[in-house]
Amino acid sequence: MNPDLSRLRPYPFERLARLLEDASPPDLEAINLAIGEPRHAAPEHVAARLAAHLGGLSRYPTTRGEPALRAALAAWASRRYGLVPELDPERHVLPLNGSREGLFAFAQCVIDRSARPLVLMPNPFYQIYEGAALLAGAEPWYVNPADPETPAPDFEAVPESVWKRCRLLYLCTPGNPTGTVFEPPLLQRLIERAHEYDFVIASDECYSEIYPDEARPPPGLLQAAAAMGLDDYRRCMVF
């Protein structure tokens, strides 16, 4: 048995469910802000296409995903973030069953538990970041906001001694639950530190397409790296 299992804390959604068991607002309809899932039905044209292809679901998919899917993902991300040259679907893209499995497995791949590693993450954070760090034998290090009125994590307050032990930095942009968007100058400073202190950035961008202004989509880590001329995206992983 992995002894690090004892370090895990209860999953927040389980705790939240227990807290809400007896909560019943008298004259108000409750708004569930717990798990981020759609509150409306799937679009009919999407459901129809899925149903039309159910006959092909009797076999396991390829490990790397279908070539057509990887090509479509690479083309979309290249358009979305203005990446030149475009992403290579053979080198840069791997489909996952949601971001959680990748965010967890990535930590197990890049962390050497013998080196007293730290995994940095914004606070508040998605629980999987902490769990992945603990089960990889690392210590989580929480990057707090500068003050309660400013939800952005204060990376300038991170001591150099912490950066030196950092092996993985989790980001979430746009952030959950704060909504914080990391702008390119900050992302580029973090990329520079990743190269200086020999760690990797895992940017959780699952909310990248939820934003109020169609003219200003949130920037991303790959976009920031490309603007620096780092078109190999070394030390940058996006989920």
Regions found by a protein language model. Give the residues of each.
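N-terminal small-domain helix-loop-helix segment of the aminotransferase-like
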Residues: 2-101, 105
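Short, intrinsically disordered, charge-balanced linker/junction segments flanking boundaries
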Residues: 19, 161, 229, 234-239
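Helix C-cap/helix->beta junction micro-motif
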Residues: 26, 136, 196-197
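Catalytic-core regions built around general acid/base machinery
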Residues: 49, 189-196
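Conserved core of the PLP fold type I
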Residues: 57-192, 208-230
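A short helix->loop->beta-strand "cap" motif at the edges of active sites that frequently abuts
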Residues: 117, 196-199, 233-234
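Short, Asp-centered acidic motifs that coordinate Mg2+ and/or phosphate
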Residues: 168, 200, 237
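Walker B catalytic acidic pair
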Residues: 205
